[in-house]
């Protein structure tokens, strides 16, 4: 664990310069053995830990974010190892990640374009295991120009190829100003709009079949409520 946290990565080496500020993409952030370990831990979780949504299912670890404050719950050791590892990179400006959302996407499943919102420190970090995905980015609907085309296609900006074992970090404009989503398809055809393709070993025109992907979205929730305060104890 100590050796893990001592690992220092110069994030600037991994910045995706073709994207607006700021995207860091680190291929092979974890090993094959770590990937297998994480998958085992995810699927060992008790059935009530899963929440089924349209197009995916998820596990929530660390508490339920709320505008009034998140009632903090201790993360399990298998997640603490990775929240500490990512926090040690400086991803959260010296703060420590305290929340993990585990999402499972089967082939053909996805999520509509959305933003993560103000409940979190304005950084989102994601470890991907099991399969790749293509993460698409969109400009928000423009209220000032109601007559302008507002379709997803017209607002589409770019994509990121997010591979197995990678770490993706989104900050600044890419977190605050744009929406991100995953199309519900069974395979991805890589186009010139995949701006991190040079970091992936893939090529424009490649067709990548999806299998089941598990993502660990690791974030810092600034506003928390300690359990003893919630229960009225001193």
From Swiss-Prot:
Cofactor field: Fe(2+)
Keyword flag Metal-binding: yes
Domain Fe2OG dioxygenase as annotated: residue spans: 96-222
A GO-annotated cellular component: cytoplasm
Domain of life: Eukaryota
Keywords (A to Z) from UniProt: Cytoplasm, Dioxygenase, Iron, Metal-binding, Nucleus, Oxidoreductase
Binding site for Fe cation: 114, 116, 180
InterPro entries, alphabetized: AlkB-like, AlkB-like_sf, ALKBH6, Oxoglu/Fe-dep_dioxygenase_dom
EC number: 1.14.11.-
Entry's cofactor comment: Binds 1 Fe(2+) ion per subunit.
Compartment(s) of residence: Cytoplasm; Nucleus
Similarity remark: Belongs to the alkB family.
Function: Probable Fe(2+)/2-oxoglutarate-dependent dioxygenase involved in oxidative demethylation of nucleic acids. Binds nucleic acids with a preference for ssDNA or ssRNA to other types of DNAs. May play a role in nucleic acid damage repair.
Name under which the protein is recorded: Probable RNA/DNA demethylase ALKBH6
Encoding gene (name): alkbh6
């Amino acid at each position: 664990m100590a050796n893990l946290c001592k690992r220092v990565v110069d994030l600037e080496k991994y910045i995706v310069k073709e994207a607006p500020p700021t995207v860091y993409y680190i291929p092979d952030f974890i090993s094959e053995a770590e990937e297998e370990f994480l998958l085992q831990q995810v699927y060992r979780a008790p059935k009530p830990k899963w929440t089924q949504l349209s197009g995916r299912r998820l596990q929530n670890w660390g508490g339920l974010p709320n505008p009034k404050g998140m009632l903090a719950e201790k993360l399990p050791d298998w997640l603490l190892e990775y929240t500490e590892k990512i926090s040690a990179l400086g991803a959260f400006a010296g703060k420590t990640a305290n929340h993990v959302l585990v999402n499972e996407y089967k082939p053909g499943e996805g999520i509509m374009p959305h933003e993560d919102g103000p409940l979190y420190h304005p950084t989102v970090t994601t470890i991907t295991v099991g399969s790749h995905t293509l993460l698409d980015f969109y400009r928000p609907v423009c209220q000032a120009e109601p007559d302008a085309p507002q379709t997803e296609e017209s607002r589409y900006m770019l994509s990121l190829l997010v591979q197995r074992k990678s770490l993706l970090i989104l900050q600044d404009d890419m977190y605050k100003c744009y929406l991100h989503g995953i199309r519900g398809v069974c395979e991805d055809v890589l186009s010139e709009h995949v701006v991190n393709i040079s970091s992936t070993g893939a090529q424009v025109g490649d067709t990548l079949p999806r299998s089941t992907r598990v993502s660990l979205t690791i974030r810092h929730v600034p506003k928390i409520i300690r359990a003893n305060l919630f229960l009225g104890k001193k």
